[in-house]
Amino acid sequence: MFSLKMRASRNGNHVSGAERLVNEEKIEKISSELIKRAMSHENGVPDFINLKIEKVTEKINKLKHLEIKTVHSTSKENSRNIARNLLKNELEKYYLKNGKDIEKIDELIDFAFKIIDAGNMRGAAILDLDGNRLENILERGIRVKNIDTTEELSEKILKDSSLTKRTVDAIAIATKVVNCGVISELCTSDNFSYTTGYVATNDGYFRILNLKDKGQVGGRVFFVENSKIDELYDKLENMPVIVY
């Protein structure tokens, strides 16, 4: 199989990115789709596109997708309270296990929302339980690479009219992230018009409507228990995963 990685930017600012794992005969077709995706992005036509094609020599790991659960909410305030509660329920277990003050969880989540609302990061921020940022380069964050879904899963998701290609991309990322040892993930889209975001934990992938306002930037935060950052980086960036 081959790994295809697309990155697009405009005036140095991130516009679009995507990852695929495909067989050799699909390289040309998927490459064309990725370039079209970059050129037609609602956030603007990029002035720089990078497409990297690389043969995968490692074993492909197959992971069962997180259960998809949609949470309906009509206001950003309510949606963020829902996301906060999902994150708190998961983080509390790790705070108690590590003897940390659970009253500090709200501060950690506040910091996470501040990060995603600031936007313009190519990758995700990583926060430990004390609120320390662990990315090697804070302005870039970490990108989850070498991922894809099976055609069967993609088709199954897209049969639901309420779900989109963004859901397919997100479920691949969320499933890999949780299986790499991340406690939970908070994400909003960098697409200005797409207001649905999500929280991912071992309990599932929770799509939350209206998690941000239209026209607002997006971002991604991973919550982690320990600081084995080099091991986590290696898994998130290099471990090939196909989600089914």
From Swiss-Prot:
Keywords: ATP-binding, Biotin biosynthesis, Ligase, Magnesium, Nucleotide-binding. It is an enzyme of class 6 (ligase). It catalyses: heptanedioate + ATP + CoA = 6-carboxyhexanoyl-CoA + AMP + diphosphate. Its cofactor is Mg(2+). One of its GO terms (molecular function) is ATP binding. Transmembrane segments: none annotated. It comes from the Archaea. GO terms for biological process: biotin biosynthetic process. Signal peptide: none annotated. The keyword Coiled coil does not apply. Homodimer. Belongs to the BioW family. This is 6-carboxyhexanoate--CoA ligase. It comes from Methanococcus maripaludis (strain C6 / ATCC BAA-1332). The lineage of its organism: Archaea, Methanobacteriati, Methanobacteriota, Methanomada group, Methanococci. The gene is bioW.
